[in-house]
Amino acid sequence: MAEGTEVVARNKKAQFEYDIEETLEAGLVLEGSEVKSVRQGKASLDGAYCQVDREGEMKIHGMYIKPYEEAGPFGHEPRRNRKLLLHDQQIGKWGQMAEQEGYTIVPLSLYFRDGWAKLKIGIAKGRQKHDKRQAIKEREMERRLEREQSDYNF
């Protein structure tokens, strides 16, 4: 991330369940109470995904933003679909990629950059169970090698 960014939420499962092929930064349309709640760190990307709708707009589905307590009855709906701000060419390209078999668009992180809410999204291909096991084995081998090297290089 660049300077001036404040990461609010990460989708840790996305790195494990998917192979991320390409990433993109998108703006996020939020209501006032949602911005205040996100600034307090009360947002979750677990189970969220992005999809292009009939009007040609990309929206994020399933993202949870806790209602802001001070908003009272004028607060927001916690799991509403939120519009992503992207160029039409980007929406078209990513929409076509997501229509391919086994591909989806997943949110990777939610952050503020220069005061604006941004969402890092990735085009991802789902992993099979054996792929996940292989990734775990590789990660464990790397950790073990680093540990052994650090023992010899005090």
Curated annotation (Swiss-Prot):
Chief localization: cytoplasm
Subcellular localization: Cytoplasm
Basic and acidic residues bias: start-end ranges: 133-154
GO molecular function: RNA binding
Any single biological process term in GO: trans-translation
Keywords: Cytoplasm, RNA-binding
GO cellular component: cytosol
Domain of life assignment: Bacteria
Segments of this protein annotated with the region Disordered: 129-154
The protein's role, per its UniProt record: Required for rescue of stalled ribosomes mediated by trans-translation. Binds to transfer-messenger RNA (tmRNA), required for stable association of tmRNA with ribosomes. tmRNA and SmpB together mimic tRNA shape, replacing the anticodon stem-loop with SmpB. tmRNA is encoded by the ssrA gene; the 2 termini fold to resemble tRNA(Ala) and it encodes a 'tag peptide', a short internal open reading frame. During trans-translation Ala-aminoacylated tmRNA acts like a tRNA, entering the A-site of stalled ribosomes, displacing the stalled mRNA.
Similarity-based family: Belongs to the SmpB family.
Official protein name in the record: SsrA-binding protein
